[in-house]
């Protein structure tokens, strides 16, 4: 099973809120996931990530999507 770190959308119309989750690559965007590793609020510009969980998933072969990878770089998540 290929695992991806990706965004799962929540919130209301024009008020998005995202969870950063570890999910099977074949699962739908808002479908089942394996674990929540963080959140992203684009309106506030805030990211809250459990970097230990992210490192554990990436060490086990999980690949972040391009969007999640750019969020990690922008908010300096993996360099802590």
From Swiss-Prot:
Signal peptide as annotated in the record: none
NCBIfam families in UniProt: S16 (TIGR00002)
UniProt cross-references to HAMAP family, sorted A to Z: Ribosomal_bS16
GO CC annotation terms, alphabetical: cytoplasm; small ribosomal subunit
One Pfam family recorded for the sequence: Ribosomal_S16
Molecular functions (GO terms): structural constituent of ribosome
Gene Ontology BP term (one): translation
Gene3D superfamilies noted in UniProt: 3.30.1320.10
Alphabetical list of InterPro entries matching this protein: Ribosomal_bS16, Ribosomal_bS16_dom_sf
Family the UniProt entry places it in: Belongs to the bacterial ribosomal protein bS16 family.
Keyword set, alphabetical order: Ribonucleoprotein, Ribosomal protein
Name by which UniProt lists this protein: Small ribosomal subunit protein bS16
Gene responsible for this protein: rpsP
Phylogenetic classification of the source organism: Bacteria, Bacillati, Mycoplasmatota, Mollicutes, Acholeplasmatales
